[in-house]
Amino acid sequence: MREVETIFQRLTPERIIFISDSCYSGATAGRTFATASRRAVVSETFLSRLSKGKGRVVLTASKASEVSEEREDLGHGVFTYYLLEGLKGKADADKDGIVTVDEAYSYVSKKVPEATGQNQHPVKKGEVEGQLVLGQVH
């Protein structure tokens, strides 16, 4: 994880969101989705909100001392499964069609411990000014 820290120190963009679904990932300090049948559409509201937030945020699947669970029935790690569900709209708490880092973290920090019998707890670290946007719900 020291390599990740070194990379972060060399980067100068206004916004960085680093997401890690790996065991002991809590020790670490925008993508558009489209399917063959549906084109990705980016709204003006999404672009406006995307350009406002500033900061560096790290979302990890678990605390530094925890193992990140993989579940065959979910097809992913538990954290990734609930993060993807959140980006599909379940994390959009205010129903504005935009999922922010805070909304996604709030969603996974509730769902992941529930699904793992309180054995795994996502972590959010970093400094943010305003809201950082992760995605738009279609």
List PLM regions with ranges.
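Cysteine endopeptidase catalytic domains of the caspase/legumain-like
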Residues: 1-138
